C-alpha cells in the first residue's frame, strides 16, 4: 500500500496500542490462550499456570496484587478472538507496508523506504507502562516532532545513547529515536520510528543507524521485539544484537556528526543510516539506552539471568560482542559499537566524530556525560529492575566497557551496577579490554542453555521481572543504585541524578520484594560496592564480582566461592571486614546506602510493600539452578545473599528459592514451608515496615544485620549500621563455631544464615513492632551481641522449627545472650512468620506442618532438653547468678557464661527490650537478662522458660533443645506452672504468634515484665527458670496465677526449695505471701517447685505493684483464665496480654482469631495443643489423658485462656498425670498445676471457675448469675473434662473477645459475639447436661478440635461426660443428703497451704480425692488465690465440710482432672464429691461469717486487690457471660455477683461468694443432681444466693428499639453471652429496653420506649451493651439509663421516674382513643395508657362523666384527612378533646402534662409534631 508515513505510523501506533492492550503483562506478548482472573486481568494461560505453579504461597495478580488461584482462572474465548483478529490485521499491515509490527515490540521491519521514513521522522521509542500506554500512545500519535523536541530535552537530561551503524554511515540522519521508558509496569513498548515504544524510564535518543543486512535488520527487529517484549529479553536480544553488532559497528562507522546533537546534556543523536539500521540502532540504542539505571536493572536482571546461566552465557557472548563493540576494542565491531556506545554513554559530542570509536573520546566525555548517562541508566535500570530487563545491563555493559576505557570509575559504576551483567559481558570484554578484564574475572560463566534463555525470555525473565526482578532486580536495582550511588558518590553528579531519577522514575511498589533484597544488597552490596567504590575499578569489580559472583552462580569467583559457599560467605561477610576498603566503604556506603535506602529505597520499599505481590514471579528465581540463587544473591548483594547462596550451595536444603534462600536455609522442608510464609511475612512486615523488609533481606545477609537492619532505619547512623553489619557479619565469623554449629552463623554456614534469614525476616517485624527502637539501642554495642544472638538465636529459633538445626544452632549459639536476644527477635520473627502465614493463606497447611514439624521440633527438642534442664532452667532462670553457684548451674554455668554474654548482650538486648518496655529487667542485669531471656525466650520456641532456657540456651544452643526437653520434663513440675509448660512447648509458637500480634504489646508486656521482674526481682531470679518467663509472659497472669496457684505455689516453692532452696529464698523476699506460700509449699512438697516458681513469680507480681501494673491492663489481663491462659499460652501470650488483655485477648484472638496474629495465636494454640497431645502421649498419657489433652488442645484450639488455665491444667495434668502416674511427683506437680491453675481460676472466683469448669464440662450450663459459680464448677477439672472446660472457657473467653471486638467493631463485635456466644452456647447452653455434652462435642468441633480429635475420641469424651453426668446425678443425691453438712476445713489460707501440703498425699488419694476436686477446687482456689482464699475464708472452704483430705483432694483435684481422662467415672465421682464438698463448702462458706472473709481478705488483698478484681471481673466474665453479668453486679450493683464472680475481694461476703459459687455449682450441668443439691443447699444456707439483683440479672429480659440489624445482632450475642433473655416485644417479663442514644443518653422516642416507660422498665442505652462487651462484664445499667428524649427534653429522667414511681401516671383517667393515629396502632396506645393506670374506653358512647373519672378523648388531628371520616366533634366533646401528644409527652417524662396545652381547641393540627418516632419499633 502506498500509505503516507504519517498514516502508516498512526496505523502502527494503533496496532501497537492494541497489542499492548492484548498483550500478556507477564510475557509481554500477545496473549495466547487468554485466561481472566477474578480481578478481570487477562494473561496467557501458560504464564498464569507457570506463575501459580512457581508460587508456594498464594499467588497474586501481577497487576493488581489480588490473590489468584487456578480455580479463579477462566478462559476468555472472546479475548482470544480479539488476539487472532489483531494478528490478522497486523499481518495484513505488515504485508501492505512492509513494516513489521510484530507484537508491537519489534522495531519496524521497514525496508529502505521505511528507513527513509525513519530518516524523515524521528523514531520515538517510548516505553509506556501498562497503565500509561494509552496516554503515551496518544502522545506518540499526537506528533513525533513534539515528542522529539521534548524527548531530546529529556534525553539530554537523562543522557541519550546514540549508536551508529556502519551500514548506514552514508545516511546521516537528523532523525532521532527516542526511547522513553516511563512505564511503571514491566510491560514496555518499543516504538519504531513509527512510534513503537520501548518501555523504559529513560528517554533515549537514538540516531537511526545505517542500513544493515536484512538479516541483521530482521534480527535487530526481532531483538527489538524481544526487547520491547521484555527488556529481560534484551539479553536474548543482545544475541540479535550480536548480529546487529556488525551493523552497529557499521553504524558506528557512520558519521553521527551528521546528526544534530539533540541531547542537551548527554543526549547524543547520531545520524543513522537506513531505517533498518534505525531499528537495529534502536536495538543497539536500547543497549546503549540502557544506562546505569538500566545497568542496575540489568544487573538485577542479569542476576536473574545469572540464575538462568544459559541465557546469561549466551548473553555473555553477546555482551562480550556488544561490549567489545562498546569498548571500541580492537574488534572492528567493538570499535564501531564502542564509539556509539561511548558516545551515548558519555553523551559525547562525538556525534561529530561518529567514527571516533576511541575510548579516549569516551574517556574524555565520560565523566559528566557518563554520570548523567549513568543516572539515566540507573533510572532505566531501576525501571528495568521493575521490568527485570537484562539487556540494559548488557547494553550498559557495552557502553560501560567504553566508559571503562574512558573511566575506571564509570566502569566501576557500570560494573557494580551491572554487576553480574558486566561481569559476564566483561568476561568476553576481558580480551578486548584489560579494564574489563577484572570485570571479566568477576564475570560469570553463563552455562545456561539457550532454551533457558528462551524460557527466561518468555517467563523466567518476565516472572523474575515481576517476581524475582521486583525482588531481585529491584534489589539489584537498589543495589545497583546504591552501587551506582556510591559510584555516583564518586561521580557526584551522577549520584544525585540517580537518586532523584530513581526515586521518581522507579515505582518501588513494583519492587516491594526488592526492598528486602535491597537491604541485603544494601548491606552486602554496600559492602561490596563500598569495596568496589573504595577500591579501584578492577578491585571493585573483583569484589563486586565476588558479591555478584555470590549472587550469580555464573561468576567464576562465585563459583569458586560457591564451591566453598560457607567459606566464601564467611569471607564475604568477613570480606566486608577483611576488605579494608570494603569495611570502610561499607560503613561509608552503608551510610550512603542507608541514606539512600532510607530515602529512595524507603519510598521504594514503601511502595514495594504493595509490589511485594511481585513475589508471585519469584518462583522463577526459585528455579533450582544455582544461577537463580546467584541472582537472588545478586539482589541481596553478594555478601549475605552470597552467603545464603553459598550456604544453599553447601546445604542443598531447598535453597532453590534463592530469594527465599535465607529462609530456605532453615530446614529444607521448613524453609520451603517458611519461605512463602517468610516471604509473606516479609511482605507483611515489609509492608508494615519497609525497612523491616530490608532487614529481612539484611537478615539474610546476617541475622545480626537484619536485626540491625530494622534498627538501620531506627539507627541514627547508617554508618554505625554498616559497622554493626560488618560486626555482625564478623561476629558470625568470630562465632563461626557457633555459627557453624548454629547453622554456620551468618557467614559461617547457610543453616545459620537461612535460620538467621528467616529469623531476620521475622526479626525485622519484631524489631519493628517491638524492638526496632530497642534494636537501635542495641545497635552499637548490642548489635554485635544481637547479631550473634540473632544469628545464634535465630538459628535456635530455626532450630526450634528445625529441631536438628535448633540443637546445633542452640548448642552452637556461642552466647546465650545471642540466643536469647535473637530469640526475642526470633520469636517476633516467628510471629511475623505466623502472621504472614496467615496472610499467605498458608495457615492451614502451615499450621499442620507446624503441628507436625515445628511443634514437634520445638516440642521434642524442648522436651528433651527440658527434663534435664528443668531444674537448671528453673534455677538458672530463677537467677542467672544462682546458676553459677547452683550445681545445676553447670549447664547454667555455661548458661551463666553465655548469659554473662547474654547479659552483656542482653544488656543491649535488654536495652532494646527496655525500649520495648523491659528497661528495668534489662537494667537488672542478670535478672534482667533472665527476664530478657524470658521475654526473648518467650519469643523463642521454648520461650516459656526462656529465662531459664536462655540460661540453658545461653549455655548452649542445645540449651534450647534442652529447654524444649526441659519443658517436657518440666511440664510435671511446670504443671504447677502448668500453662507455662504447655506454653513452653506451644507457647513458643503461640507466643510467637501472640508476640507477633503483640509486637507493640510486647513492649507493654515487657514493661510489665520489667516491673514484675523488679518486684519479683529475687523471686523471678529464683523462679525465673519456670516462672520468670511465666511472670514475664504472664506478668499479670503470673500474679493472678500466684494468687491462684498460691497453694500449689507453696508446693512449687517447697519443690523449688528442695530443688533449689536458694531460689525459694530468693523468691521469698519477693513476697511475704510468696514466702509463706513458699514455706508452706516447702512443707508440702518440693515437687511443686515449678508451680511454686510460677506462683512465686506470679505472686510477687501480684503482691508487688508489678501486678498492679498488670492490673492497669484490662481486667481480662488479670482474669484467672486469661492469666492462666497467658501462662499456658506462653510468655508470648503474656506479652500480648500486657498490650492487650493477655489471656482474654489471646483467648479472644485465638478463639475469634480476629487478626492474623490472633489467628496465628490460635494456630499456635492448635499447635501447642497438638504438642500437648504429643506430650501427653510422650507422658504415656492414657486415652483418658489424651482426652484431657484433646480437651486441652480443644481449649487451646479455642485459644482460650480459660482453656489454657483449666485445659492447661488438664492437659499438663493429663500428660503429667500419665507422667504423674509414672511419677507421683510429676503428678503432684500436675496436681499443683491443676490446683494452681484452678486455684488461679478459682482465685478470682473459685466457685465460678470451678462451677465454670464443671459447667462447661457438663454443658457449660452456668447461666448468667450462676454462670460464675457454674463456671467455677465448669472449671473444676474433676467435674468437667478439660475439653469441655476449656471449650467453655474458650467460649467464654471467645465471648469476651467477641465482646471486646464487638466494641471495637460492631461487625466484628457481632461476629465475635456470635462466635463467642455460639461457642458459649455450646458450653453455656442450658442447664441440661445432655445439651452440655452435646455442646462439648460441638465445642470440640468448633474449637477445631475435630482436626485434633478423632471421631472416636470425641465419642469417648462424650461418653465420659455422660458417665460423669450420671455420676453427678449420684453426687446430686449425695449432696442432697450431705449437701448442707460443711466439711469444717480451716477457713484460713493455712488450710489451703495445708491442702497444698496435703497435695502430695492427694496424689495418693488422687483417684478418690480427685473426686473431691470440685470441692477442692473451690477450696484450692481459695487457698491458692489470696482473693479467692479470702472469699473462701469468708466462705470458708474448710467449713465446707470438706476435710483437709478433701481439701487435699481438691488440691489433687488436678489429678481427678487427670482422672477424668484416666477414669471419667472416678472423675465423675470425684466431681460429685467435689460438688458435694463444694456444695457443702459453699453452704458452710455461705454460713461462714463475713468476718472470716474479711479477715482472710486482708492477707490476700494485695494479691487479690490487684489481680482478683481484674481477674474476678475479667476472668469471671471471660469465663462466662453469666460471670460477666455477675461481675458487673459485683462491680456496681450486687455483692452476690461478686461472689459469683468470686471477685469480691473486699465487698462480696463469703456467703455471697459461696452462694454464687453454690448457685454456679447448682447451675453447672456438671452436677445435675449436684446442682439441685447445691440449689437446695444454697436455699437452705442462704436464699441470698439468688439475690434479687442476681436473679434480676439472670432474669433480665431485653427488647431492642431503634437499633440497626447489626446492632441487634450484637445485642443478641450479648444476651446469649450473658444468658439474658431477648425478645421482640415488650411483655410483663421484659425488664430492659435497649435503645439507641447519644452520648448524653438522649434517645429517639419509639413505641417500645413509651411502652417501656409506661411499664416501669429499664430504658437503657445501647451503650450499655457495648460497654459491657468492652469491659467483659455485665455493667450496671444505672449509668446507662436513658435520661431524656429528643422531644421532651434531654434530662427529664422519665424512665427513672417511671421505675421508681409507686403511682400510676394516668390513674383515675378515663380515656378514649379516637382513631386515626399515625405511627402507632390504637391497641398499642391503649395498652400504653392501661400500663399507666388509665381506664381505656373502647367505645366513645361508654365515655361518661358519671363514673367520677375524668373523661378524655385522644385524637390526632394531623392524621385527619379528607379521605378519612373525621370523628364527630360533637360526640367527642363528651370528654376533653386532647391531642395524643399529651399522652406521649406525659409518658416520656412520666408526669402528667398540663392538658390545656394539648386541648385540640387550643392548638392547631400541626401540634402533633411529637408523635413517637418509629413508634412501631
Curated annotation (Swiss-Prot):
Keyword check for Transmembrane helix: no
GO CC terms: BRCA1-A complex; BRCA1-B complex; BRCA1-BARD1 complex; BRCA1-C complex; chromosome; condensed chromosome; condensed nuclear chromosome; cytoplasm
Region (Disordered): 305-346, 640-720, 735-768, 874-907, 959-982, 1146-1185, 1259-1290, 1375-1486, 1498-1534
Compositional bias (Polar residues): 308-319, 640-652, 959-976, 1405-1426, 1473-1485
Segments of skewed composition (Acidic residues): 1176-1185
UniProt zinc finger (RING-type) residues: 24-65
Modified residues (Phosphoserine): 114, 393, 686, 706, 717, 975, 1153, 1155, 1181, 1242, 1298, 1304, 1344, 1380, 1414, 1482
Chief subcellular location: nucleus
Feature: compositional bias, Basic and acidic residues: 320-340, 669-679, 891-901
Keywords of this entry: Acetylation, Activator, Cell cycle, Chromosome, Cytoplasm, DNA damage, DNA recombination, DNA repair, DNA-binding, Fatty acid biosynthesis, Fatty acid metabolism, Isopeptide bond, Lipid biosynthesis, Lipid metabolism, Metal-binding, Nucleus, Phosphoprotein, Repeat, Transcription, Transcription regulation, Transferase, Tumor suppressor, Ubl conjugation, Ubl conjugation pathway, Zinc, Zinc-finger
Motif residue range(s): Nuclear localization signal: 497-503
Single GO term (MF): RNA polymerase binding
Record-level GO BP terms: cellular response to indole-3-methanol; cellular response to ionizing radiation; cellular response to tumor necrosis factor; centrosome cycle; chordate embryonic development; chromosome segregation; DNA damage response; double-strand break repair
Name of the gene: Brca1
Residues with PTM Phosphothreonine: 1351
Protein role: E3 ubiquitin-protein ligase that specifically mediates the formation of 'Lys-6'-linked polyubiquitin chains and plays a central role in DNA repair by facilitating cellular responses to DNA damage. It is unclear whether it also mediates the formation of other types of polyubiquitin chains. The BRCA1-BARD1 heterodimer coordinates a diverse range of cellular pathways such as DNA damage repair, ubiquitination and transcriptional regulation to maintain genomic stability. Regulates centrosomal microtubule nucleation.
UniProt cross-references to Gene3D superfamilies, sorted A to Z: BRCT domain, Zinc/RING finger domain, C3HC4 (zinc finger)
Domain BRCT: 1588-1682, 1701-1800
Bias (Low complexity): 744-760
Positions with biased composition (Basic residues): 1161-1170
Catalytic activity: S-ubiquitinyl-[E2 ubiquitin-conjugating enzyme]-L-cysteine + [acceptor protein]-L-lysine = [E2 ubiquitin-conjugating enzyme]-L-cysteine + N(6)-ubiquitinyl-[acceptor protein]-L-lysine
Name assigned to this protein: Breast cancer type 1 susceptibility protein homolog
Amino acid at each position: 500500500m502506498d500509505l503516507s508515513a504519517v498514516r502508516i505510523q498512526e496505523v502502527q501506533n494503533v496496532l501497537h496500542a492494541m497489542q499492548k492492550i492484548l498483550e500478556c503483562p507477564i510475557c509481554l506478548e500477545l496473549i495466547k490462550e487468554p485466561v481472566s482472573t477474578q480481578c478481570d486481568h487477562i494473561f496467557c494461560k501458560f504464564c498464569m499456570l507457570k506463575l501459580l505453579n512457581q508460587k508456594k504461597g498464594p499467588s497474586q495478580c501481577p497487576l493488581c496484587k489480588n490473590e489468584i488461584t487456578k480455580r479463579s482462572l477462566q478462559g476468555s474465548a472472546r479475548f482470544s478472538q480479539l488476539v487472532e483478529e489483531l494478528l490478522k490485521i497486523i499481518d495484513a499491515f505488515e504485508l501492505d507496508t512492509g513494516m513489521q509490527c510484530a507484537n508491537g515490540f519489534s522495531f519496524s521491519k521497514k525496508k529502505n523506504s521505511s528507513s527513509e521514513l525513519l530518516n524523515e521522522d524521528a523514531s520515538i521509542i517510548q516505553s509506556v507502562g501498562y497503565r500509561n500506554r494509552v496516554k503515551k500512545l496518544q502522545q506518540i500519535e499526537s506528533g513525533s516532532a513534539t515528542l522529539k523536541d521534548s524527548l531530546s530535552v529529556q534525553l539530554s537530561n537523562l543522557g541519550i545513547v546514540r549508536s551508529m551503524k556502519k551500514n548506514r554511515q552514508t545516511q546521516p540522519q537528523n532523525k532521532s529515536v527516542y526511547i522513553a521508558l516511563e512505564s511503571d509496569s514491566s510491560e514496555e513498548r518499543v516504538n519504531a520510528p513509527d512510534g513503537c515504544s520501548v518501555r523504559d524510564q529513560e528517554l533515549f535518543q537514538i540516531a537511526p543507524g545505517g542500513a544493515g543486512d536484512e538479516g541483521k535488520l530482521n534480527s535487530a527487529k526481532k531483538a527489538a521485539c524481544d526487547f520491547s517484549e521484555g527488556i529481560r529479553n534484551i539479553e536474548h536480544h543482545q544475541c540479535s544484537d550480536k548480529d546487529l553488532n556488525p551493523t552497529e559497528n557499521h553504524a558506528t562507522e557512520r558519521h553521527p556528526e551528521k546528526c544534530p546533537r539533540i541531547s542537551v546534556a548527554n543526549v547524543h543523536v547520531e545520524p543513522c543510516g537506513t531505517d533498518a539500521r534505525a531499528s537495529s540502532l534502536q536495538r543497539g540504542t536500547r543497549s546503549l539506552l540502557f544506562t546505569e539505571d538500566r545497568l542496575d536493572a540489568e544487573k538485577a536482571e542479569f542476576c536473574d539471568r545469572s540464575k538462568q546461566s544459559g541465557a546469561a552465557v549466551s548473553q555473555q557472548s553477546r555482551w562480550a560482542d556488544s561490549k567489545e563493540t562498546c569498548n571500541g576494542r580492537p574488534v572492528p565491531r567493538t570499535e564501531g559499537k564502542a564509539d556509539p556506545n561511548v558516545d551515548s554513554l558519555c553523551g559525547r559530542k562525538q556525534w561529530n566524530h561518529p567514527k571516533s570509536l576511541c575510548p579516549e573520546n569516551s574517556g574524555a566525555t565520560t565523566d559528566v556525560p557518563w554520570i548523567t548517562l549513568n543516572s539515566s541508566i540507573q533510572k532505566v535500570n531501576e525501571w528495568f529492575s521493575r521490568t527485570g530487563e537484562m539487556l540494559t545491563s548488557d547494553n550498559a555493559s557495552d557502553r560501560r566497557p567504553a566508559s571503562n576505557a574512558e573511566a575506571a570509575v564509570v566502569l566501576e559504576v557500570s560494573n557494580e551496577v551491572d554487576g553480574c551483567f558486566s561481569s559476564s559481558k566483561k568476561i568476553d570484554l576481558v580480551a578486548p579490554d584489560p579494564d574489563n578484564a577484572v570485570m571479566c574475572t568477576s564475570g560469570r560463566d553463563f552455562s545456561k542453555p539457550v532454551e533457558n534463555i528462551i524460557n527466561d525470555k518468555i517467563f523466567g525473565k518476565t516472572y523474575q521481572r515481576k517476581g524475582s526482578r521486583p525482588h531481585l532486580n529491584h534489589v539489584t536495582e537498589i543495589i545497583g543504585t546504591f552501587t551506582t550511588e556510591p559510584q555516583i558518590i564518586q561521580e557526584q553528579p551522577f549520584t544525585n541524578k540517580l537518586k532523584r531519577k530513581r526515586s521518581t522514575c522507579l515505582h518501588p511498589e513494583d519492587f516491594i520484594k526488592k526492598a528486602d533484597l535491597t537491604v541485603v544488597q544494601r548491606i552486602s552490596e554496600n559492602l561490596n560496592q563500598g569495596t568496589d567504590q573504595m577500591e579501584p575499578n578492577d578491585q571493585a569489580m573483583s569484589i563486586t564480582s565476588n558479591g555478584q559472583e555470590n549472587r550469580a552462580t555464573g561468576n567464576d569467583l562465585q563459583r569458586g566461592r560457591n564451591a566453598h559457599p560457607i567459606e566464601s560467605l564467611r569471607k564475604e561477610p568477613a570480606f566486608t571486614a577483611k576488605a579494608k576498603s570494603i569495611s570502610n566503604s561499607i560503613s561509608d556506603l552503608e551510610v550512603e546506602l542507608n541514606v539512600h535506602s532510607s530515602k529512595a529505597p524507603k519510598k521504594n520499599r514503601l511502595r514495594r510493600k504493595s509490589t511485594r505481590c511481585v513475589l508471585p514471579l519469584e518462583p522463577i528465581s526459585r528455579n533450582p539452578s544455582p544461577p537463580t540463587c546467584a541472582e537472588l544473591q545478586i539482589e541481596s548483594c553478594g555478601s549475605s545473599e552470597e552467603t545464603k547462596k553459598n550456604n544453599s550451595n553447601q546445604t542443598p536444603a531447598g535453597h532453590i528459592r534463592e530469594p527465599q534462600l535465607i529462609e530456605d536455609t532453615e530446614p529444607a522442608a521448613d524453609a520451603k514451608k517458611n519461605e512463602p510464609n517468610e516471604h509473606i511475612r516479609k511482605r507483611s512486615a515489609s509492608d508494615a515496615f519497609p525497612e523491616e523488609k530490608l532487614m529481612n533481606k539484611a537478615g539474610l545477609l546476617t541475622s545480626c544485620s537484619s536485626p540491625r537492619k530494622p534498627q538501620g532505619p531506627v539507627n541514627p547512623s547508617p554508618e554505625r549500621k554498616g559497622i554493626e553489619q560488618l560486626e555482625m557479619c564478623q561476629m558470625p565469623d568470630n562465632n563461626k563455631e557457633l555459627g557453624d554449629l548454629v547453622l554456620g552463623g551468618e557467614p559461617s554456614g547457610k543453616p545459620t544464615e537461612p535460620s538467621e534469614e528467616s529469623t531476620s525476616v521475622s526479626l525485622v517485624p519484631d524489631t519493628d513492632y517491638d524492638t526496632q527502637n530497642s534494636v537501635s539501642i542495641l545497635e552499637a554495642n548490642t548489635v554485635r551481641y544481637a547479631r550473634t544472638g540473632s544469628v545464634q538465636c535465630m538459628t535456635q529459633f530455626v532450630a526450634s522449627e528445625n529441631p536438628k538445626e535448633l540443637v546445633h544452632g542452640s548448642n552452637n549459639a556461642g552466647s546465650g545472650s545471642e540466643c536469647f536476644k535473637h530469640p526475642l527477635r526470633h520469636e517476633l520473627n516467628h510471629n511475623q512468620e505466623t502472621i504472614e502465614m496467615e496472610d499467605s493463606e498458608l495457615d492451614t497447611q502451615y499450621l499442620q506442618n507446624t503441628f507436625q514439624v515445628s511443634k514437634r521440633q520445638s516440642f521434642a527438642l524442648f522436651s528433651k532438653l527440658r527434663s534435664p534442664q528443668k531444674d537448671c532452667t528453673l534455677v538458672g532462670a530463677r537467677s542467672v547468678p544462682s546458676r553459677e553457684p547452683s550445681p545445676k548451674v553447670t549447664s547454667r554455668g555455661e548458661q551463666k557464661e553465655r548469659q554473662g554474654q547474654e547479659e552483656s548482650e542482653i544488656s543491649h538486648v535488654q536495652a532494646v527490650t527496655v525500649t520495648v518496655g523491659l528497661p528495668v529487667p534489662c537494667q537488672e542485669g542478670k535478672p534482667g537478662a533472665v527476664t530478657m531471656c524470658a521475654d526473648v525466650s518467650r519469643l523463642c520456641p521454648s520461650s516459656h522458660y526462656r529465662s531459664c532456657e536462655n540460661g540453658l540456651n545461653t549455655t548452649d544452643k542445645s540449651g534450647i533443645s534442652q529447654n524444649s526437653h526441659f519443658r517436657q520434663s518440666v511440664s510435671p513440675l511446670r504443671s504447677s506452672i502448668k500453662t507455662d509448660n504447655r506454653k513452653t512447648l506451644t507457647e513458643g509458637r503461640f507466643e510467637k504468634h501472640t508476640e507477633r500480634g503483640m509486637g507493640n504489646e510486647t513492649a507493654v508486656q515487657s514493661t510489665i515484665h520489667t516491673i514484675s521482674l523488679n518486684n519479683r526481682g529475687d523471686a523471678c531470679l529464683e523462679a525465673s527458670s519456670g516462672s520468670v518467663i511465666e511472670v514475664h509472659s504472664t506478668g499479670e497472669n503470673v500474679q493472678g496465677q500466684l494468687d491462684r496457684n498460691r497453694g500449689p505455689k507453696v508446693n512449687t516453692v517447697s519443690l523449688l526449695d528442695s530443688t533449689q532452696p536458694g531460689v525459694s529464698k530468693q523468691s521469698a523476699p519477693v513476697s511475704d505471701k510468696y514466702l509463706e506460700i513458699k514455706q508452706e509449699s516447702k512443707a508440702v512438697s518440693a515437687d511443686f517447685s515449678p508451680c511454686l516458681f510460677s506462683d512465686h513469680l506470679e505472686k510477687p507480681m501480684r503482691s508487688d505493684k508489678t501486678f498492679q501494673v498488670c492490673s492497669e491492663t484490662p481486667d481480662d489481663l488479670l482474669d484467672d483464665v486469661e492469666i492462666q491462659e497467658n501462662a499456658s499460652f506462653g510468655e508470648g501470650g503474656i506479652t500480648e496480654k500486657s498490650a492487650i488483655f493477655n489471656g482474654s485477648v489471646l483467648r479472644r484472638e485465638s478463639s475469634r482469631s480476629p487478626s492474623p496474629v490472633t489467628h496465628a495465636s490460635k494456630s499456635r494454640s492448635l499447635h501447642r495443643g497438638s504438642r500437648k497431645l504429643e506430650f501427653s502421649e510422650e507422658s504415656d498419657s492414657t486415652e483418658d489423658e489424651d482426652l484431657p489433652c484433646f480437651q486441652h488442645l480443644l481449649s487451646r484450639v479455642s485459644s482460650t485462656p480459660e482453656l489454657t488455665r483449666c485445659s492447661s491444667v488438664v492437659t499438663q495434668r493429663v500428660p503429667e498425670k500419665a507422667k504423674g502416674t509414672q511419677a507421683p511427683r510429676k503428678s503432684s506437680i500436675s496436681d499443683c498445676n491443676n490446683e494452681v491453675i484452678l486455684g488461679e481460676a478459682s482465685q478470682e472466683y473459685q466457685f465460678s471457675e470451678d462451677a465454670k469448669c464443671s459447667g462447661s464440662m457438663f454443658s457449660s450450663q452456668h447461666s448468667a448469675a450462676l454462670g460464675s459459680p457454674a463456671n467455677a464448677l465448669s472449671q473444676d477439672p474433676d467435674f468437667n473434662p478439660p475439653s469441655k472446660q476449656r471449650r467453655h472457657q474458650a467460649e467464654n473467653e471467645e465471648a469476651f473477645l467477641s465482646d471486646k471486638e464487638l466494641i471495637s467493631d460492631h461487625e466484628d463485635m457481632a461476629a465475635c459475639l456470635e462466635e463467642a456466644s455460639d461457642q458459649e452456647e455450646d458450653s453455656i447452653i442450658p442447664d441440661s447436661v445432655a445439651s452440655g455434652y452435646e455442646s462439648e462435642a460441638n465445642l470440640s468441633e468448633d474449637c477445631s478440635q475435630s482436626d485434633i480429635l478423632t471421631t472416636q475420641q470425641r465419642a469417648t469424651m462424650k461418653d465420659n461426660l455422660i458417665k460423669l453426668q450420671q455420676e453427678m446425678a449420684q453426687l446430686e443425691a449425695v449432696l442432697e443428703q450431705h449437701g448442707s453438712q460443711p466439711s469444717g476445713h480451716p477457713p484460713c489460707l493455712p488450710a489451703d497451704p495445708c491442702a497444698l501440703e496435703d497435695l502430695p498425699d492427694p496424689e495418693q488419694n488422687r483417684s478418690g480425692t480427685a473426686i473431691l476436686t470440685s470441692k477442692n477446687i473451690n477450696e484450692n482456689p481459695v487457698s491458692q488465690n489470696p482473693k479467692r482464699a479470702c472469699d473462701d475464708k469468708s466462705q470458708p472452704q474448710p467449713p465446707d465440710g470438706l476435710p483437709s483430705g478433701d481439701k487435699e483432694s481438691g488440691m489433687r483435684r488436678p489429678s481427678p482432672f487427670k482422672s477424668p481422662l484416666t477414669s471419667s467415672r472416678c472423675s465423675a465421682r470425684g466431681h460429685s464429691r467435689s460438688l458435694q464438698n463444694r456444695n457443702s463448702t459453699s453452704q458452710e462458706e455461705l454460713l461462714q461469717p463475713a468476718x472470716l472473709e474479711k479477715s482472710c481478705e486482708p492477707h490476700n488483698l494485695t494479691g487479690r486487690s490487684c489481680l482478683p478484681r481484674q481477674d474476678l471481673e475479667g476472668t469471671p466474665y471471660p469465663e462466662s457471660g453469666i460471670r460477666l453479668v455477675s461481675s458487673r453486679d459485683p462491680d456496681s450493683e450486687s455483692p452476690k455477683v461478686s461472689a459469683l464472680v468470686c471477685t469480691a475481694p473486699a465487698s462480696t461476703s463469703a456467703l455471697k461468694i459461696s452462694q454464687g459459687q453454690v448457685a454456679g455449682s447448682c447451675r453447672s450441668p456438671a452436677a445435675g443432681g449436684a446442682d439441685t443439691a447445691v440449689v437446695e443447699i444454697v436455699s437452705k444456707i442462704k436464699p441470698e444466693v439468688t439475690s434479687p439483683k442476681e436473679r434480676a440479672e439472670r432474669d433480665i429480659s431485653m427488647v431492642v428499639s431503634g437499633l440497626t440489624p447489626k446492632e441487634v445482632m450484637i445485642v443478641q450475642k450479648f444476651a446469649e453471652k450473658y444468658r439474658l433473655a431477648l425478645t421482640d416485644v415488650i411483655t410483663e417479663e421484659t425488664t430492659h429496653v435497649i435503645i439507641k442514644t447519644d452520648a448524653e443518653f438522649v434517645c429517639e422516642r419509639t413505641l417500645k420506649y413509651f411502652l417501656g416507660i409506661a411499664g416501669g422498665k429499664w430504658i437503657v442505652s445501647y451503650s450499655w451493651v457495648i460497654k459491657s462487651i468492652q469491659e467483659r462484664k455485665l455493667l450496671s445499667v444505672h449509668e446507662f439509663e436513658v435520661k431524656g428524649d429528643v422531644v421532651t427534653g434531654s434530662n427529664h429522667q422519665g424512665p427513672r421516674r417511671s421505675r421508681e414511681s409507686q403511682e400510676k401516671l394516668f390513674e383515675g383517667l378515663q380515656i378514649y382513643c379516637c382513631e386515626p393515629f399515625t405511627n402507632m396502632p390504637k391497641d398499642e396506645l391503649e395498652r400504653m395508657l392501661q400500663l399507666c393506670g388509665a381506664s381505656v374506653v373502647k367505645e366513645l358512647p361508654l365515655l361518661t362523666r358519671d363514673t367520677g373519672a375524668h373523661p378524655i378523648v385522644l385524637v390526632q388531628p394531623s392524621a385527619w384527612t379528607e379521605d378519612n371520616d373525621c370523628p364527630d366533634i360533637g360526640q367527642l366533646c363528651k370528654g376533653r378533646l386532647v391531642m395524643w401528644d399529651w399522652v406521649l409527652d406525659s409518658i416520656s417524662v412520666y408526669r402528667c402534662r398540663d392538658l390545656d396545652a394539648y386541648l385540640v381547641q387550643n392548638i392547631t393540627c400541626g401540634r402533633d409534631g411529637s408523635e413517637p418516632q418509629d413508634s412501631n419499633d
